[in-house]
Amino acid sequence: MESNAHGRISGRIWFSAIFFGLIGQIAWIVENMYFATFAQDIFSNSGRADMAYLVTTLMVVFSALTATITTVIAGGLCDKAGKRKPFIAYGYIAWGFTIMLFALLPMSVTEANLALVATLLVVFDCIMTVAGSTSNDAAFNAWVADNTSPSNRGRVNSALSVLPVFAVVIVFIGLGSMYDPSAASNSTFFTSSVIIES
């Protein structure tokens, strides 16, 4: 496991913290801003707007439970392995692929497929949450603690705390125009979100 840094923070640590911190925030912003909208648009386009609220509620509930459980378990695995970097590097790649799962879903479905799509939305959201909670919430946050000390950790955390603002701007400018609720599919939107993150 990386030892705590003391005093001055190296450029490598700063770069890694900002780079992975921003990528993580972009991914979370895509989930927080578009996943619920995506689900609501699917059911509205399918003539079952009443299902949208149930499905989005289930997505929020199960995603929150998944995030809590995953962070605890993944944090323990990171500590046991004694390494953070593999969990971060490979975890972020997996995170991108799990976001792309949503590209497989159409924007309108038949009555016979409504239950299947509703289930897939919840499952895909949970899978994405497992990847994100492992790589970002558990491994990356622990890596920051490992590579900073009480005397300089505040500076890094302050920089990380403003990244969600930049992530919102990037998602709005880079992706907002690509999302079309009336399209047959929004695969371009979800695929492009992963490209921007990478």
What is the meaning of each model-derived region?
Residues 41, 110, 167-196:
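Transmembrane alpha-helix termini and helix-breaking/packing motifs in multi-pass membrane transporters
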Residues 53-78, 97-98, 172:
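Central cavity-lining transmembrane alpha-helices of secondary-active solute carriers
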Residues 79-94:
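Cytoplasmic membrane-interface "Motif A"-like loop-to-helix N-cap segments
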Residues 90-115:
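C-terminal ends and interior cores of transmembrane alpha-helices
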Residues 2-65:
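Helix-loop boundary and gating motifs at the non-cytosolic
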Residues 35, 133-149:
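Intracellular juxtamembrane helix-capping segments at the cytosolic ends
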Residues 63-68, 154-180:
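Glycine-rich segments within core transmembrane alpha-helices of 12-TM secondary carriers
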Residues 50-54, 150-160:
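Loop-to-transmembrane helix entry/capping segments in MFS-fold secondary transporters
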